[in-house]
C-alpha cells in the first residue's frame, strides 16, 4: 500500500475506535495534518452521533465545517474524552515529535485536556529514538535568534521555517517556527521541559509529558494497535 492508502486506513480505523469507545453526544478533539484529514473524512460518516469537534488549527476547522461538523471553542467544553491526531515520529513509549503542519501549540493544548490521546500514523513514523525528523519549536518572533543560539548549543541545527516565497512561516498564533535538525532525543520528557522553559519559546513539538495513550499504526498487514503506559 502507498503512504496515502495507509493514512486512509488509519483514519478509518480511528473513526471506528471513536464510534466504539466514545458515547453519543460527545465532542471529539481533532488534530491537524494529512493523516488527521483522513480521520475527519471518515468521521463525517458518523458525525450525527456527536455534538461536534474541537479543532487544533484553522485548516482543521475549515475541513470539519466542510463536512458539516460543528466546531466548538475549547473554552466551551467541560471535558474531552478523546483527541485524535497524527505524528511526525513516535517512539516505543508513545512520545512523539509533532508540528510538521505548524499547529503544535494548539495541538498540545487540546491534547492536554483529553482523557485519551489516539495517535494515527503509518509505519514509517515509528522510530526507536526521536530526532531524525526536524524538531519544530514555535517561538515569539523577537526571540528567534536567541532561541536559535540555545538550540545550536544543544547540538542541533535550527532552520527558520519559510513559505514558498521565502517569507517566514507564521503560525495561527502569529509566531514563527524553528525546525531543529540533528538532535538525537534520548530523553524527550527532559528535553521538552527544558526547551519549554526558555523565555520566548511558545512550545516545542515534543509530546512526551503528555504522549499518546495508544497508536493506530498502518502497516502492510493492516492496522496495529499499540498501547502505552500512562504518561
UniProtKB/Swiss-Prot annotation:
By its UniProt entry, which NCBIfam families does this protein fall under?
Answer: PRK00702.1, rpiA
GO cellular component terms listed in the entry, alphabetical order: cytosol
- Name the gene for this chain: rpiA
Task: Write down the chemical reaction(s) this protein catalyses.
Answer: aldehydo-D-ribose 5-phosphate = D-ribulose 5-phosphate
Q: In which pathway does it act?
A: Carbohydrate degradation; pentose phosphate pathway; D-ribose 5-phosphate from D-ribulose 5-phosphate (non-oxidative stage): step 1/1
Q: What is one GO biological process annotated to this record?
A: D-ribose metabolic process
> Recorded E.C. number(s)?
5.3.1.6
> What job does the chain carry out?
Catalyzes the reversible conversion of ribose-5-phosphate to ribulose 5-phosphate.
> Per its record, how is this protein called by name?
Ribose-5-phosphate isomerase A
Q: Which family does it belong to?
A: Belongs to the ribose 5-phosphate isomerase family.
- Which species does the entry assign this protein to? Burkholderia mallei (strain ATCC 23344)
